[in-house]
Design a protein with these regions (language model features):
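Short, basic/low-complexity N-terminal boundary segments at the transition from targeting/disordered tails
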Residues: 30-50
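Active-site loop segments of alpha/beta catalytic cores
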Residues: 1-35, 98-349
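Short acidic, Pro/Gly- and aromatic-enriched capping/linker segments at domain boundaries
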Residues: 45-63
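Short aromatic-enriched loop/helix-cap "lid" or pocket-rim segments at secondary-structure transitions
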Residues: 41-44, 59, 74-76, 82-83, ...
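A contiguous, low-structure linker/loop signature
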Residues: 59-106, 126-133
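Compositionally biased, low-complexity repeat tracts
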Residues: 2, 18, 30, 56-57, ...
Length: 349
């Protein structure tokens, strides 16, 4: 890292992209999905999702493109999930009758892309200052669970794998059609993919099942990044370190939120700064107590950075989640981010 110190200051975008490429950079980037209301400084990353796919998110809930109803929860600041008990597919063999891709006729893709870029700029993150990542959906496993619920969805994967493949192939074809229409108007700096295939304890499915039923579709989608020579990131919560090799095999460069239930030191030892850990911190244990001190919060940040950022290959990704306006949550997050922006800015000097 030392050779870059003293040179012209890198933008958040430049610093983040250099991190993803395994290159020298000036400070620990903070990975985000995009600017939050009230922010004035550019963020490292803005995640652009085609409006046709995420209009329900922009509206705070409602039907996704497939007809799944998403609802928010107060306790998670309105974060959305499929409405419990209201699933649209109860028999995987009948998916052809239920799952219908929406029409893409008459869409002005260039205007759609520009609206998203303009929104980022209006929030203080123009694309010359903030990287633009391109994402489309929550993941192939997660889409299946959204259609069927976990009980029926997992049974379908075990009992009717060929039907699952056919369904996921169908939705993959749709997503790739959307991507091929809009991605060159977006000109993304990064390709983002997602799939929460794990709990804190372990993946929902075996590695073999993941490689047979889920990975092929991620591989097809990852071609969008490989063909353009841009970094590829994977969002996957939970204990999924046994899947890192699979992700790397299709070109993934980074993993968020890389939770602490994983053997992150083992991942770091194997890949060094060529596979970026974006996380390595969780709001668990003592940090959740009401009397947690400011110093304990700051120490948790320093420990994560000391563990994983020492040779690069690390981005901060973490914070407390609670109801909008929760004062204790805001207090803790303000302390955390202050430490990220002080310790993380001096770590490589």
């Amino acid at each position: 890292m030392a050779e870059i110190i003293g040179k012209a200051h890198l933008t958040e975008k430049e610093n983040y992209l250099r991190t993803l490429r395994g290159q020298d950079h000036e400070f620990v980037p903070t990975y985000t999905f995009g600017p939050m209301p009230g922010m004035t400084e550019p963020v490292a990353n803005c995640m652009l999702e085609p409006e046709i796919l995420v209009e329900f998110r922009m509206n705070g809930g409602g039907l996704d493109p497939w007809g799944v109803n998403y609802v928010g929860t107060t306790e998670t600041a309105g974060a959305l999930l499929p409405e419990p008990g209201n699933f649209i597919l109860d028999d995987i063999t009948k998916w052809h009758d239920v799952i219908k891709a929406p029409s893409l006729e008459g869409i002005d893709w260039e205007a759609m892309a520009q609206r998203s870029l303009d929104r980022f700029a209006a929030m203080g993150s123009p694309r010359d200052q903030s990287a633009v990542s391109f994402n489309m959906h929550v993941g192939y496993f997660q889409n299946l669970m959204a259609f069927m619920g976990f009980e029926e969805g997992l049974c379908a994967m075990s009992e009717e794998p060929e039907e699952v493949k056919a369904l996921l192939s169908y939705i993959c074809d749709f997503y790739m059609e959307v991507a091929n229409h809009i991605i060159d108007y977006v000109q993304p700096d990064v390709l983002t993919m997602m799939d929460d295939v794990a709990t804190w304890r372990a993946p929902f499915i075996s590695k073999d099942m993941f490689e047979e039923l889920i990975l092929p579709w991620h591989n097809i989608q990852a071609s969008l990044g490989r063909e353009r020579g841009i970094p590829i990131t994977m969002h996957c919560c939970g204990h999924a370190d046994n899947l890192v090799d699979d992700w790397v095999s299709i070109g993934v460069n980074a993993w968020d939120p890389a939770q602490t239930c994983n053997d992150l030191k083992g991942v770091k030892a194997k890949y060094g700064n060529k596979f970026v850990i974006m996380g390595g911190w969780d709001s668990v244990g003592r940090l959740l107590e009401k009397d947690v001190t400011e110093e304990e919060l700051r120490l948790s940040v320093r420990e994560s950075m000391d563990n994983y950022a020492y040779d690069g290959g690390y981005c901060w990704c973490g914070g407390f989640l609670g109801p909008i306006g929760d004062e204790e949550c805001m207090r803790k997050n303000n302390i955390i981010m202050d430490e990220v922006n002080t310790y993380g800015r001096t770590l490589y000097k």
